[in-house]
Amino acid sequence: MRIADYSVTKAVLERHGFTFKKSFGQNFLTDTNILQKIVDTAEIDDQVNVIEIGPGIGALTEFLAERAAQVMAFEIDHRLVPILADTLRDFDNVTVVNEDILKVDLAQHIQNFKNPDLPIKVVANLPYYITTPILMHLIESGIPFCEFVVMMQKEVADRISAQPNTKAYGSLSIAVQYYMTAKVAFIVPRTVFVPAPNVDSAILKMVRRPEPAVAVEDENFFFKVSKASFTHRRKTLWNNLTGYFGKTEEVKDKLTKALDQAGLSPSVRGEALSLAEFAGLADALKGQGL
């Protein structure tokens, strides 16, 4: 029997008198086939260390611990710590850290792996209400995670993996794809969770690029420009950028020159631009002193 078997999950929750906290976005997976697929998608073996976020009662952790060198699981809910100590008692390669992943000194914790030089993968069922902040925090942490295989709301997975000229494409697509390749591995129906969420989920596989997707003079400025370009999706690049930089004649003159230099029409919308085109635009705007 597995932790994720519905009868086991139910028994564990009842034994410990556990009640779900909506504020933590807790939805526990009760489908062993899907858990197996997640671990297979992540290609976990004994030459990999794993960071897990939000282990719950250890359903995914169990599958990870059977294959990984070590698993470090970050759980914000202190009520789950004794439950995890119970459900994962047979594993000596799991460490549960009762901390908020957004506040913890992750670099310090990673040194506690027995072999911190092994590649590190992030495999997690992320809380829906805080998926994007957690992902961006980890991607921008400077820690060389080689891969992420994470469950999230399907709509967010679609946005992250979206290509130009699609409805889902936006500043989040650019922010993630600058660092990683991103592809939806498979869809997870809402019916396999306790309690069932209101939406379907997706497993997103992201692999770190050896170098960022495009070369830019100023990364922060590049992200600001891409974000500003999507402020109002239905507006043109010109309208969004004058809304961001200002509408003085000087700004308009510089903006005209930058767009011309980048080979872009003022009437194009942000969703039509590739990462390379955003890079060219950001560098041209920077060159104009904007």
Swiss-Prot record:
EC number(s) given by UniProt: 2.1.1.182
Name of this chain's protein: Ribosomal RNA small subunit methyltransferase A
Chief location bin: cytoplasm
Keyword RNA-binding annotated: yes
Subcellular compartments: Cytoplasm
UniProt keyword annotations, A-Z: Cytoplasm, Methyltransferase, RNA-binding, rRNA processing, S-adenosyl-L-methionine, Transferase
GO CC field: cytosol
Signal peptide: none
CDD domains: AdoMet_MTases
First-tier enzyme category under EC: transferase
SUPFAM superfamilies recorded: S-adenosyl-L-methionine-dependent methyltransferases
Taxonomic path: Bacteria, Bacillati, Bacillota, Bacilli, Lactobacillales
InterPro entries, per the entry: KsgA/Erm (IPR001737), rRNA_Ade_diMease-like_C (IPR023165), rRNA_Ade_Mease_Trfase_CS (IPR020596), rRNA_Ade_methylase_Trfase_N (IPR020598), rRNA_adenine_dimethylase (IPR011530), SAM-dependent_MTases_sf (IPR029063)
Family: Belongs to the class I-like SAM-binding methyltransferase superfamily. rRNA adenine N(6)-methyltransferase family. RsmA subfamily.
Pfam family, one: RrnaAD
Function: Specifically dimethylates two adjacent adenosines (A1518 and A1519) in the loop of a conserved hairpin near the 3'-end of 16S rRNA in the 30S particle. May play a critical role in biogenesis of 30S subunits.
Reaction(s) catalysed by this chain's protein: adenosine(1518)/adenosine(1519) in 16S rRNA + 4 S-adenosyl-L-methionine = N(6)-dimethyladenosine(1518)/N(6)-dimethyladenosine(1519) in 16S rRNA + 4 S-adenosyl-L-homocysteine + 4 H(+)
Gene3D superfamilies linked to this entry: Ribosomal RNA adenine dimethylase-like, domain 2, Vaccinia Virus protein VP39
Organism of origin: Streptococcus pneumoniae serotype 4 (strain ATCC BAA-334 / TIGR4)
Disulphide bridges: none
Coiled-coil features, chain-numbered ranges: none
Highest taxon of source: Bacteria
One GO molecular-function entry: RNA binding
HAMAP family in alphabetical order: 16SrRNA_methyltr_A
Annotated residues for binding of S-adenosyl-L-methionine: N27, L29, G54, E75, D100, N125
